């Protein structure tokens, strides 16, 4: 199994907690490789994370993406969000071609069950599996041309990278971001929803529980 994160040095404690939660609940049938897109993670913190993952008999690979904005090819206004949020759109750019499926997790997520449950989901021919986000209002849906469509949360993604590459999803997403620079509330999440709306497999809400969802109860 391949798990992907995009984090900077400030998010290392949260990433460590996430990795611990993944392996603590994993059945162990399949090996896990943790792929970390690193934007400035120090050598000391990389070493500590590597030692921790090795103790769990799993694998960890770092990718230096400190120059990831060069791959974007344009300047982008994230409206106050950390610029690294856009890096997940470049997953096919940085990950090896032999990786055909990947789970993306926000670094501050905690996994409470076996991650294999998500890994083995049937995407039904879609490019990406995402969990619906119930807190988005009509005005934002209209702005993204999503009337009549579900809006989805990008904190957890199950991606068919083979299809992502063959259908040029990255180019489409980056083109959309460039055209909407500074006018997307949730940046990459909005882009994923707007561009891939017909290619998203809606996953069960049990696979992603957010504080926003808790507040709505």
Map each language-model feature to its residues.
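Histidine-anchored nucleotide/phosphate-binding helix
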Residues: 12-26
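Acidic donor-binding segment of Leloir-type glycosyltransferases
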Residues: 33, 38-63
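Single conserved hydrophobic/aromatic residue that forms the stacking wall/gate
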Residues: 209-217
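Conserved donor-nucleotide/metal-binding helix-loop-beta segment in metal-dependent transferases, i.e.
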Residues: 113-138
């Amino acid at each position: 199994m391949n798990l992907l994160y995009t984090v900077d040095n400030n998010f290392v404690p949260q990433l460590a907690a996430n990795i611990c939660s993944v392996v603590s609940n994993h059945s162990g049938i399949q090996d896990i490789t943790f792929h970390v897109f690193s934007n400035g993670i120090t050598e000391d913190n990389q070493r500590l994370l590597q030692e921790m993952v090795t103790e769990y008999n799993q694998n960890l690979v770092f990718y230096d993406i400190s120059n990831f904005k060069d791959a974007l090819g344009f300047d982008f206004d994230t409206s106050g969000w950390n610029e690294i949020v856009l890096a997940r759109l470049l997953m096919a750019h940085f990950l090896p071609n032999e990786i055909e499926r990947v789970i993306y997790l926000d670094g501050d997520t905690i996994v409470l069950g076996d991650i294999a449950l998500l890994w083995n989901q049937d995407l039904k021919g879609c490019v990406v599996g995402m969990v619906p986000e119930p807190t988005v209002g009509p005005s934002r849906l209209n702005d993204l041309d999503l009337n009549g469509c579900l809006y989805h949360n990008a904190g957890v993604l199950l991606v068919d990278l083979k299809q992502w590459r063959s259908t040029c999803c990255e180019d489409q997403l980056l083109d959309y971001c460039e055209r909407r620079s500074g006018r997307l509330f949730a940046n990459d999440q909005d882009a994923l929803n707007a561009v891939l709306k017909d290619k998203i497999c809606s996953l069960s809400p049990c696979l992603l529980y957010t504080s926003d969802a808790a507040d709505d109860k």
